[in-house]
């Protein structure tokens, strides 16, 4: 999935999705685009080097996903216990979409409950 299609997919997940470039003050992270729900990130990638998307995931699923899919890699700059990376060059679109929806739901559910 190319960068534009992935961006549109993330924004289509709900009216509560926001996108930001929050790290513009940092030279090496100025191109990192982050997608948020309820003010918390669920997906991000570097626009200048669109090769890995970092997503939230249930800890109990991560090892299974890594074993089943070569495209599952270490997350960029996040805890590998709760986050995974997905190689955009080799990941099938359906897997990327499923894992992105999952990440969105994890964060939305967790922080919606805290807002109530």
Can you say where each PLM-predicted feature lies in the sequence?
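Charge-dense, helix-prone N-terminal extensions
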Residues: 1-116
